Amino acid sequence: MRLYIDVETYRPRKEEAFTREKIIAIGILEDWTPYTPDSSKIWDEPDVRLHYFTEWELGEESRVVSQFYDYLGGLIRDWKSRRIDFINVVGFNILRYDIPLLTQKGIEYNVAGLAELNKLWYDAYTIDYFQTTLPFHDMRFKELNIKYLVEKAENNGIDVPEPFGSGRDVKDWYENKEYDKILKHLEMDLKIVRVIDLNYKQVYDI
């Protein structure tokens, strides 16, 4: 199965990434469909399932992190016992941001030690569409975002969901308790990455 992941955070100042940053929501999209472009037309359960771990429902960041790791650990155990054929963790900028932050928070909240958390992520094969897109963006980090990926896909004839807001909007939504907008933003980003993943050959024209 493919596990699409996106983490939303709150930090008062942009430059305080990782130092004064709180995980407020983790979005998960489970995909049990065949790994083909035709699967991007399938969105119904049980083939495709959305899950959220949010601070406003669970009460505090530590529970968001611990419940997420309980969930991921269960999937890894199912894979090792061969109840699941494979697990691919897929996202956008997850190698540089989401996974390091989740590892940091897992240690902070005593979910597990560094070696155990690293092994957990190592056991889940990872695809990061930020990294895979760099060669098609002249290896430039600036302006390489979800919006760029959507435009690239659309230019190559792929029907991609429209983004809802951006990561910059999350701070204001959180402060104004507009949690439904954060969830909508998560949902659309997850769906976008899924369509990109299923159609990667056409996206990159390869």
Language-model regions, residue ranges each:
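Conserved non-catalytic scaffold segment of RNase H-like nuclease domains
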Residues: 1-104, 154-155
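Metal-dependent phosphoesterase core characteristic of DEDDh/y 3'-5' exonuclease domains
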Residues: 22-24, 32, 47-48, 84-184, ...
